[in-house]
Amino acid sequence: MNNNLPSEAVAHAVAVLKNEHVIAYPTEAVFGVGCDPDSETAVMRLLELKQRPVEKGLILIAASFEQLKPYIDDSRLSDSQREAIFSCWPGPVTFVFPARPETPRWLTGRFDSLAVRVTNHPLVIELCEAYGKPLVSTSANLTGQPPCRTTAEVHAQFGDSFPVVDGATGGRQNPSEIRDALTGELFRQG
């Protein structure tokens, strides 16, 4: 399936994000729901939708490492750690970095760290580039339901009027692997 968004669809998604609302979009394995990481209003809407406590923290998904720099502190990374991370990106591996002190608690939760990923999904890259920043990203599913893998499944769980960027997932069966950026410790198998 062609994942190149027509400019009208990108413009609509960006408008929804700018209005502090949540959108759904395909990622490497499943559909995600996301919003503007700098909007507490939008993040609280997402957390309420997912019935997820703010203390758990969230993941940011980005088109490039540059988009993530305002949120994370990569100064403690050695050259070999940096090389290990960049060898996985862009791709379906999420790394937990120390957060910058100014990174909002609505993103980090009870942690002093933040999980981030540079995606290789062309549609998400285009969306993040058009919006000019990363998106909060978590699986598109209601509590107790399986993650959505199609636009139809998103509409079945969230309603027909829920804003969805239509497209195909990347075909992976498992969600992204999650690792500690400093130690390489595996938190979740991908």
From Swiss-Prot:
Compartment(s): Cytoplasm
Keywords noted in UniProt: ATP-binding, Cytoplasm, Nucleotide-binding, Nucleotidyltransferase, Transferase, tRNA processing
MF (Gene Ontology): ATP binding; double-stranded RNA binding; L-threonylcarbamoyladenylate synthase; tRNA binding
GO terms under biological process: regulation of translational fidelity; tRNA threonylcarbamoyladenosine modification
Recorded catalytic activity of this chain's protein: L-threonine + hydrogencarbonate + ATP = L-threonylcarbamoyladenylate + diphosphate + H2O
Predominant cellular place of this UniProt entry's protein: cytoplasm
Listed Pfam families: Sua5_yciO_yrdC
Residues covered by the YrdC-like domain: 7-190
UniProt xrefs under PROSITE patterns: YRDC
InterPro entries reported for this sequence: DHBP_synth_RibB-like_a/b_dom (IPR017945), Sua5-like_dom (IPR006070), TC-AMP_synthase (IPR023535), TC-AMP_synthase_SUA5 (IPR050156)
Presence of the UniProt keyword ATP-binding in the record: yes
UniProt record similarity statement: Belongs to the SUA5 family. TsaC subfamily.
Protein name according to UniProt: Threonylcarbamoyl-AMP synthase
Organism ancestry: Bacteria, Pseudomonadati, Pseudomonadota, Gammaproteobacteria, Enterobacterales
Underlying gene: tsaC
